[in-house]
Amino acid sequence: MKNVINQLYWDRMSETYLYGTAFKKNAKNEVTFKNKLMPSGKTLISWSSIANYQVTKEVPSLPLLLNGQEYLLKISAKIKPENSAIFGIHFFDIQGNEIDKVIFTNLEQKFKYPTRAVKYTIKIISGGVEEINFKKIQISPLDLEEEVFNDFYPHPIYLNKNSQKEGLILLDDSKRARIIAPFKIESYVGANLIIGYLSWQNKQRGFELLKDYIKEHQDKKLVIFSSSADIDKSLENFKSLNCTVVYSEDFVNKGYYNLQETYLSKNYRESDQVRMVKKAINYFEE
């Protein structure tokens, strides 16, 4: 089973409260919402797991969830005044009746998807909000470790404490999800292998964490494998560090490394992590 962190953004203008609102969105899909006169109790924005395409011409904005499974919802946002936003997760049955809800004001919340639910919505409601600087909401299975949400997350797929070699495969997150490799390698491959996931929305912070990771692993013969031309550019600043870099043109095919994905890209890609791991294994066997 894949461990998937679904990521959603403030991209539903039809569901946004605009009366008297100053609204800004940048290329990273980060939103600034300002409205000092908005009455308490009004909904700033809502998302739904089901949409009537013929009416709204929009697809559902929330991922499908499994009945009876527990999840963690994390909100990346700064709210002024603090704790003045009220968040609600509402669950509905097949008749459209609300069967349960979770209301909270903190930026992290556990919840269980009811067994009878066929739809859910997420809302941000004003409790005296004047400004929100909003990045994203992340929804994941509850049992994932906390570090998996970081802007750079190193995920080991093969570890041998006696090996002095290490391969680190760098992957950009998809705009809609971070998909953690659902496999481990059992047999010896000549080096420790790690897949490093980089946030597309906050890549600068991700590379700062990557530099710290490299310094912490200076006792290893570290080889970094790049999977995109965009990562190649950032790795140009790593030449002074004690590591070897295999750039994307030598690691993946040209059609892939030239495919630069942004939030508004028409092309959707999911990294072929199995193929990249095989390429890294071959590198250490040569």
List each model region and its residues.
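Extracellular and organelle-lumenal recognition/adhesion modules and their flexible linkers in secreted
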Residues: 1-286
